[in-house]
Amino acid sequence: DLHAVTTAFKTLYPGKWISTGISKGGQTSLLYRVFFPDDVDVSVPYVAPLCYAREDGRHEPFLRRVGTEADRKKIEDFQLEVLKRKARLLPRFEKMCTEKNYTFRAPLEEIYDFCVLEYSFSIWQWGTDIRSIPETSASDDTLLDHLLAISGPSYFIVDSPTLSFFVQAARELGYYGYDIAPFK
């Protein structure tokens, strides 16, 4: 209970208070302000997604409009290229996952696909410069390194520190879906 914690600590730290967070933490910061508006002086929810359904559906249209047409094409071309090269890239992907002791609840091939699907959202969410996307003619290593830097598999590991959020998202809060049409 953030209210009880804040109340207790204000006796030790009587200065200004801030609440902040990203994703679920952003939701918490936002809702904390709603229910206890006088507990903190400033609320900074960096990302506070409030989904309308288990699979929200608003993200896919947003991804079809954000940036320029050339930006969106560059993103999709990159995704298509790493899918085309999956057979060549998967061994290095698997090696990296093994070295990091990653374990998953789905086959590694599906985790790779999820990384590719997550890419279009992640690149915008983290403010990555679209010019940093490698050309489709780039080497296998260059393409895989870029994919891993933007939407790596740690997002999907079994012992993820965000696992409880994903369970809550699946059961209560909702989450965004993936538009798979361009990749069929």
Task: Pin down the residues of each PLM region.
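Alpha/beta-hydrolase active-site loop
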Residues: D1-L12
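Alpha/beta-hydrolase fold nucleophile elbow
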Residues: Y13-S23
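Structural recognition of the beta-strand scaffold that forms the well-ordered cores
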Residues: I18-T20, V42-P45, A169-R171
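Glycine-rich nucleophile elbow surrounding the catalytic serine of serine-hydrolase chemistry
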Residues: G21-L31
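Short, flexible loop/turn elements at secondary-structure junctions
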Residues: S23-K24, V47-L50, G174
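A catalytic-pocket lid/entrance helix-loop region that shapes and gates access to the active site
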Residues: D38-K100
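Alpha/beta-hydrolase fold active-site neighborhood
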Residues: K95-K184
